[in-house]
């Protein structure tokens, strides 16, 4: 039975389609992600908190859902926009359908949308605030919700997705990495555990002294959602520990490291989200295909005169994809070397943290 869903954008556009998932209304920043697969990993990626996700590939849900692919403890995106929803998934590991998955976590979905046209609109005008309704609501009321919601730069999204208490894994390992959790993905944790490292995951508000009590051999500043300037505690941690520990940053972690050493960050027009972003290493000349999910990036001009340098660039738009301190063992990447979803071209970068 067809049930209408509506998506309102802050520019006044109302898009109608077929509802699936939970019967509710959600607001968020409407973003698109490129890639033919990976909807489970993307929906459960904490970096999508505060955002309504639109995959550009037209068919979604065709291989179902299994918890094995989760990148956190559940869906973190606010909603899902698709061209076509597959009603009968086929995969040996599938435990539930995509609509059932969304309903389980109270998330609305809309199908039958011209996602190509909406992607072009966002590409040309930039990301927009939106409101997605799968329950009855007046168009004007829905549009008002889209327009009046706080900007993503005004919300402490990291606080919504980080751990509340420290988590210790593989405690008896000979080496130990502390993860400053801003929205860590499971694949990042697994990448460290596969190196037989001990892992301690702490809230981003944990003080430098408390971190050092764990006697770590290295520090990982994790990926996560939102505006890095709001994660002041993590910035201060990098400043305090950069001369005492090797530090590695992923995605939001790169932005936090850049801010700690005096560079600036800016919000991108529509960001990088997907599994096919080409990145060039400026030292080796090699090019890797990477998985990315970020709406902020380092201002390359602001790096001049600081103690950090740009080591990798995005080949699509020239934005910084890697930075490194000129003297200290501090480095970072803007992409996701752990994949989940996406290619594993750069997963060996975790080895470098241990080499330090």
From Swiss-Prot:
GO molecular function, one term: carbamoyl-phosphate synthase (glutamine-hydrolyzing) activity
Entry-linked SMART domains: CPSase_sm_chain (SM01097)
Top enzyme class: ligase
Biological or metabolic pathway of the protein: Amino-acid biosynthesis; L-arginine biosynthesis; carbamoyl phosphate from bicarbonate: step 1/1; Pyrimidine metabolism; UMP biosynthesis via de novo pathway; (S)-dihydroorotate from bicarbonate: step 1/3
Residue segments, region CPSase: 1-176
Entry annotated with the keyword Methyltransferase: no
Catalysed conversion reaction: hydrogencarbonate + L-glutamine + 2 ATP + H2O = carbamoyl phosphate + L-glutamate + 2 ADP + phosphate + 2 H(+)
Domain Glutamine amidotransferase type-1, residue spans: 176-356
Highest taxon of the lineage: Archaea
UniProt-listed InterPro entries: Anth_synth/Amidotransfase, CarbamoylP_synth_ssu, CarbamoylP_synth_ssu_N, CarbP_synth_ssu_N_sf, Class_I_gatase-like, CPSase_GATase1, GATASE
Keywords: Amino-acid biosynthesis, Arginine biosynthesis, ATP-binding, Glutamine amidotransferase, Ligase, Nucleotide-binding, Pyrimidine biosynthesis
GO BP terms, alphabetized: 'de novo' pyrimidine nucleobase biosynthetic process; 'de novo' UMP biosynthetic process; glutamine metabolic process; L-arginine biosynthetic process
Residues annotated to bind L-glutamine: 47, 224, 226, 252, 255, 293, 295-296
Alphabetized CDD domains for the sequence: GATase1_CPSase
Signal peptide: none
Active site: 251, 336, 338
Enzyme Commission code(s) on record: 6.3.5.5
Pfam families attached to this UniProt entry: CPSase_sm_chain, GATase
UniProt record similarity statement: Belongs to the CarA family.
Known partners and oligomeric status: Composed of two chains; the small (or glutamine) chain promotes the hydrolysis of glutamine to ammonia, which is used by the large (or ammonia) chain to synthesize carbamoyl phosphate. Tetramer of heterodimers (alpha,beta)4.
Its job: Small subunit of the glutamine-dependent carbamoyl phosphate synthetase (CPSase). CPSase catalyzes the formation of carbamoyl phosphate from the ammonia moiety of glutamine, carbonate, and phosphate donated by ATP, constituting the first step of 2 biosynthetic pathways, one leading to arginine and/or urea and the other to pyrimidine nucleotides. The small subunit (glutamine amidotransferase) binds and cleaves glutamine to supply the large subunit with the substrate ammonia.
PANTHER family: CARBAMOYL-PHOSPHATE SYNTHASE SMALL CHAIN, MULTIFUNCTIONAL TRYPTOPHAN BIOSYNTHESIS PROTEIN-RELATED
Official protein name in the record: Carbamoyl phosphate synthase small chain
The encoding gene: carA
């Amino acid at each position: 039975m067809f049930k209408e869903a509506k998506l309102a954008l802050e520019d006044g556009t109302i898009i109608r389609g077929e509802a699936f998932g939970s019967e509710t209304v959600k607001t968020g920043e409407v973003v698109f992600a490129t890639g033919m697969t990976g909807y489970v990993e993307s929906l459960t990626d904490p970096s999508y908190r505060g955002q309504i996700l639109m995959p550009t590939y037209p068919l979604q849900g065709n291989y179902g859902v299994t918890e094995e692919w989760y990148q956190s403890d559940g869906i973190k995106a606010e909603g899902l926009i698709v061209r076509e929803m597959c009603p009968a998934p086929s995969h040996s590991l599938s435990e539930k359908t995509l609509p059932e998955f969304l309903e389980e976590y109270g998330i609305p979905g809309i199908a039958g949308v011209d996602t190509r046209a909406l992607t072009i609109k966002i590409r040309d005008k930039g990301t927009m605030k939106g409101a997605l309704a799968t329950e009855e609501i007046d168009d004007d009321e829905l549009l008002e919700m889209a327009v009046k919601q706080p900007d993503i730069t005004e919300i402490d999204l990291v606080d919504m997705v980080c751990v509340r208490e420290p988590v210790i894994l593989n405690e008896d390992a000979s080496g130990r990495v502390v993860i400053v959790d801003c929205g860590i993905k499971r694949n990042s944790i697994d990448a460290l555990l596969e190196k037989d490292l001990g892992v301690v995951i702490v809230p981003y508000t944990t003080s430098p002294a408390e971190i050092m009590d764990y006697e770590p051999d290295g520090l990982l500043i994790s990926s996560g959602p939102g505006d890095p300037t709001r994660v002041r505690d993590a910035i201060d941690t990098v400043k305090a520990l950069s001369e005492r520990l090797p530090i590695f940053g992923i995605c939001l972690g790169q932005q936090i490291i850049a801010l700690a050493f005096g560079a600036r960050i800016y919000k991108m027009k529509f960001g990088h989200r997907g599994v096919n972003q080409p990145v060039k290493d400026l030292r080796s000349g090699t090019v890797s295909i990477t998985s990315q999910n970020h709406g902020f990036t380092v201002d390359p001009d602001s790096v001049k005169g600081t103690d950090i340098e740009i080591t990798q660039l995005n080949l699509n738009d020239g934005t910084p994809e890697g930075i490194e301190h000129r003297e200290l063992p501090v480095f970072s990447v803007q992409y996701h070397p752990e994949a989940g979803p996406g290619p594993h071209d750069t997963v060996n970068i975790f080895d470098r943290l241990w080499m330090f």
